[in-house]
Regions:
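Extended beta-strand/beta-hairpin segments
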Residues: 1-53, 64-146
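Alpha-helical metal-binding/catalytic segments enriched in His/Glu/Asp
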Residues: 55-59
Length: 146
């Protein structure tokens, strides 16, 4: 393992098998997520889906934060991520991604939304920066005015 430096830090997650079909991943702060199934058979999120969750959460947090700085806070926002996954060979990696941003807000300015998305994609979202090495990330957005 390489050393931590002032410009590099290790992140940690611990994943424990529940003895059946589930795995609980926990971070040092105590946050957790279920992969597989819980002991009652209820489905959790799959490991590959967690990559998509990470991308949606990372870019979503960036976009809202940037818009808030521009005094353009959406009333509501959803981020939908699709990953195109190989199925014919192992490992079954993602080769392309599509991110769709849905934002609700009568006062949102298209220019500010576009700039927030661009800044997230090109500068701030570490998950996107990592996944972009696996394949291109395309994005679209819609502003819903009610």
């Amino acid at each position: 393992m390489s050393e931590e430096t002032p410009t590099n830090v290790w992140k940690e997650i611990n994943t424990a098998w529940d003895g059946q079909d589930g795995y609980i991943a926990t971070n040092p702060a105590g946050g957790s997520v279920l992969m597989g199934k819980d002991k009652q058979g209820n489905p959790g999120v799959g490991p590959m889906e967690l990559l998509l969750v990470g991308l949606a959460g990372c870019t979503g947090m960036d976009v809202v934060s940037i818009l808030e700085k521009k005094r353009q806070k959406p009333e509501k926002m959803e981020v939908r991520v699709l990953g195109n996954q190989k199925t014919d060979t192992y490992p079954k990696v993602f080769t392309e991604f599509h991110v769709e941003y849905l934002m609700w807000g009568n006062d949102l300015k298209e220019k500010d939304v576009e700039q927030a998305i661009q800044l997230s994609e090109e500068k701030y979202c570490s998950v996107g920066g990592t996944l972009a090495k696996a394949g291109p990330i395309h994005s679209t957005y819609r502003i819903i005015r009610e």
